[in-house]
From Swiss-Prot:
Keywords: Developmental protein, Endoplasmic reticulum, Membrane, Protein transport, Translocation, Transmembrane, Transmembrane helix, Transport. GO terms for cellular component: endoplasmic reticulum membrane; Sec61 translocon complex. It comes from Canis lupus familiaris (Dog). Belongs to the SecY/SEC61-alpha family. This is Protein transport protein Sec61 subunit alpha isoform 1. InterPro entries: SecY/SEC61-alpha, SecY_CS, SecY_dom_sf, Translocon_Sec61/SecY_plug_dom. NCBIfam families: 3a0501s007, PRK08568.1-5. The gene is SEC61A1. The lineage of its organism: Eukaryota, Metazoa, Chordata, Craniata, Vertebrata.
Amino acid sequence: MAIKFLEVIKPFCVILPEIQKPERKIQFKEKVLWTAITLFIFLVCCQIPLFGIMSSDSADPFYWMRVILASNRGTLMELGISPIVTSGLIMQLLAGAKIIEVGDTPKDRALFNGAQKLFGMIITIGQSIVYVMTGMYGDPSEMGAGICLLITIQLFVAGLIVLLLDELLQKGYGLGSGISLFIATNICETIVWKAFSPTTVNTGRGMEFEGAIIALFHLLATRTDKVRALREAFYRQNLPNLMNLIATIFVFAVVIYFQGFRVDLPIKSARYRGQYNTYPIKLFYTSNIPIILQSALVSNLYVISQMLSARFSGNLLVSLLGTWSDTSSGGPARAYPVGGLCHYLSPPESFGSVLEDPVHAVVYIVFMLGSCAFFSKTWIEVSGSSAKDVAKQLKEQQMVMRGHRETSMVHELNRYIPTAAAFGGLCIGALSVLADFLGAIGSGTGILLAVTIIYQYFEIFVKEQSEVGSMGALLF
């Protein structure tokens, strides 16, 4: 069945737009340049409004997922990386359930990647139509078929640009991947904005600055009771406060600390005597992949729930999936799940909410830990990082594990890699929950993604530096 499926996909893969692999080794300076160009294009698309929309002032139904999915409401980046990640999620689940078996051959890998890109384009079209027809930009009957089609085309072209930008970096022209770059940029931008935003918000206590740092100085300057001013700056509700900022810094430090946890397996050369090395198996073996896929799962569930809720409000099954309420406290108007499955899969708003509704907290914790562990364990099977794949790579490099024969390497690696993947995914989920409960800026998932991505780029720089010799030689 797997071969038949990949063969069915093959004719479509030929006509898909594709970035050619570089014919020569790309120098680090060029990689930095291409990465900067990619980021510039993404940021420009984040600021270009969609042409033809009548209104985007209503409550934002996807406010809680925008930071993680690198999307910006009412712009060309409305969909963000959602189509790419969703297609990856679908293909992984199909491969994990053995509905599609991906072989070890380069041909099968290429067809699998092509199928993922094809699904990404189909999902882009589907999400574009759903966004337009559910009235996110105005009543479709008032806008007319022409404007609806125009908005759909804009969203599709923007989604295609994101797909190609991600492929450009992954083919070796830039550093890391487009998905990682866009997520990290969006989250870091959010953190900086929440800390230093000069925007004023009218609260019950009067006009206050949104940014936590600016609010601290403003409150100290305008309040006669300095102790109360400090208390407000640290604990004010519905706006970023200093405790949120401290929690964010704390989570950053904890994740970076855990990044250093690993098991070094001793290996030696099968060709040369006395040549020894180690193969590191990190605690976060699959890095941030589990949390990205978990976010894609939840975001698509939110989309389906809100679409059904808008059309069939009051239906029992729709209500069981999720009921939604609009809120505008402490920021822009947004929709928030207040009941049903979506409510229990969303993080509690604060530590106080955990105490008020412990069942919600327990369900959320179990879901986060379980889903992250599952996605992490299944990801290694389809990404070429399982014990069998690692043993094959070591064999190609003529390396063997010390104290083990070449034939027993897979068995020995199986003792470590699946465990590291599952336990690492579990830890990723636990850290995300901790960040949510502490009230970290940008959500626990967002902070975790930002730290792991920034650490990945740090490792890339260190690796390139060791190859070239110095940071100056890298850039100049």
